[in-house]
Structure formats: structure tokens, C-alpha cells
Amino acid sequence: MAKKEGKKKPIFDKVGLVFRSPIRADIMKEISHNVQKPQEIADKFEIPKQNINYHIQALKKGGLIKTHTEEREEMPSERGVRINGKSESGKFKVSYGVELTKNGKNIVNQFIDPLYEKENEKEKIKNKKKEEE
């Protein structure tokens, strides 16, 4: 029987993209809870914003995260919000921060969350042993 030559499944490509750098997995985990601006992520991880932007762009290119967009009644006053015009209903179209795409959510649920859970369990066991000493 001839070997079937085929492409890797797309999910493996996307998982590989995330795990090329541990910070990408951390970014994905962090934004799985809520939309965040790159500066907020950089501050939380104590990493320069340009490094965070580099990883965000790679994750965007891979289709795992996207820029969060919404419509607002009033002109936004906070920093880091981009105004993209007005909708037909007269609301401001704004974009800010990043959020997971459907594929990104799948990656977090299938691969990243279980890894963090195992890591947290190991940490709890370690702490418990220290307390018993």
C-alpha cells in the first residue's frame, strides 16, 4: 500500500506556532479570559511591548488571535483605542486589544489549559511538601 503524502493537519501547524515560544502560550492563556491591550500584557509579564507585539503579530498571522472591534455610542477617551470610522447606525467603530479567534479558543481548550492545570497541580504538591517540613 502506497504511503499517502499529505499536509500536516492545520491544527498541528497552529499548535506548533504557539509552542515555538513559551510567551505565546502565556499570551494565549492570558487573553482567553478577556480582551487585553498589548501594553497591559507587556506590563503583566514584565516584557517590553515590542516583544509582545512581535508574538502577537505571529499569532495573528497564524489566525489564532485578532484585534477586538466593537461599536460605541460615544467617542472613546482612553488611550490605545483606534477609531475606524462610523457605522451606518452612527456609532463609532473602534478597535483595541486582542482576543482569541475560534481556532485560538480551540488551541487553548485542548492544549494550553491542560498544561497549565498540570503545572498548577505540581506547584500545589510542592507547596504542600514545604508546609509539611
Feature names for model-found ranges:
Residues L17-R24:
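Short helix-coil-helix linker/hinge
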Residues A2-I11, K29, N84-E133:
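Amphipathic alpha-helical dimerization/coiled-coil segments
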Residues Q50:
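Key DNA-contact positions within bacterial/archaeal DNA-binding proteins
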Residues P22, H33-Q39:
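Short capping segments at the starts of secondary-structure elements
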Residues K60-E73:
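A short, conserved structural fragment
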Residues E40-K44:
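A short acidic, leucine-rich amphipathic alpha-helix
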Residues A25-I31:
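Hydrophobic residues on short alpha-helical segments
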Residues I56-Q57:
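Short, hydrophobic-biased segments on the C-terminal half of alpha helices
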